[in-house]
């Protein structure tokens, strides 16, 4: 789960943990905005770019995603392939991201650098059903994007090498402040049901729960799409 816009608490502002990334200047300001995800911490920062608008340098906001675990080169190739699959199938719904290997807090590891998404509404939260239906009616582009997301996700589940896209993280699929749908997870974005029994023959109950929650939320997205079409 990746949370990109929730500001740090006042306590967190004074107790920021260290994050020393060798290839990122310490002068680049960033703040920890989420430490609750399954795979990573999320830091948010910004800097002025060389691009200009009306004679003024633009300000670019970005997120740094730092994994909880150490990843091998093979792991990193899997992460990149999965993210590239997202980008190829979902286009601009998935932010551009760079997977970089460097020294982080004294150890070799990977981090993800991506443009920040300003989360406006949690489209995958079933408690927001009525509001979600109204928003999909009001913003047809978002509705088309969500329909594309659902179609692609179902295709992955029903195709060869079946996989379930990670909707377990509540903030993985959102509507941004431009009223467009964004998928913002980065680390291990798919669950594979054929791995449920792979370790010693025992059922992986944690993985099973994540798959079931993701499938329920996918069904919920199909439901709000149908409801928004019925009321048009």
Model feature map: region roles:
Residues 72-79, 123-126, 193:
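Active-site-adjacent loop/helix micro-motif of nuclease/hydrolase catalytic cores
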Residues 137-141, 145, 160-163, 176-232:
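C-lobe/activation-segment region of protein kinase-like
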Residues 27-84:
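ATP-binding glycine-rich loop module of kinase domains
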Residues 75-84, 136-153:
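Well-ordered, non-membrane alpha-helical segments in soluble/globular domains
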Residues 59, 107-109, 179:
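Conserved catalytic motifs of the protein kinase core domain
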Residues 66, 87, 91-145:
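Conserved structural core of kinase catalytic domains
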Residues 1-31:
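Juxta-kinase regulatory segment immediately upstream of eukaryotic protein kinase catalytic domains
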């Amino acid at each position: 789960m990746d949370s990109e816009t929730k500001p740090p608490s006042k306590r967190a502002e004074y107790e920021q943990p260290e994050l020393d990334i060798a290839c990122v200047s310490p002068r680049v300001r960033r703040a920890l905005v989420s430490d609750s995800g399954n795979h990573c911490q999320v830091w948010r920062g910004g800097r002025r770019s060389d691009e200009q608008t009306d004679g003024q340098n633009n300000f670019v906001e970005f997120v740094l995603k730092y994994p909880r675990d150490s990843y091998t080169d093979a792991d990193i190739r899997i992460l990149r392939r999965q993210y590239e699959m997202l980008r190829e199938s979902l286009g601009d719904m998935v932010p551009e991201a760079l997977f970089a290997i460097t020294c982080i807090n004294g150890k070799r590891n990977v981090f993800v650098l991506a443009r920040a998404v300003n989360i406006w509404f949690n489209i995958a939260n079933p408690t927001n059903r009525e509001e979600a239906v109204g928003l999909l009616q009001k913003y047809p582009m978002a509705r088309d994007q969500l329909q594309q997301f659902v179609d692609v996700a179902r295709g992955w589940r029903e195709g060869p090498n079946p996989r379930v896209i990670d909707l377990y993280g509540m903030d993985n699929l959102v509507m941004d402040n431009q009223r467009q749908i964004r998928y913002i997870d980065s680390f291990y974005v798919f669950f594979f049901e054929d791995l449920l029994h792979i370790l010693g023959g025992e059922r992986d109950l944690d993985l099973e729960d994540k798959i079931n929650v993701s499938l329920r939320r996918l069904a919920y997205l199909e439901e709000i799409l149908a409801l928004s079409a019925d009321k048009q």
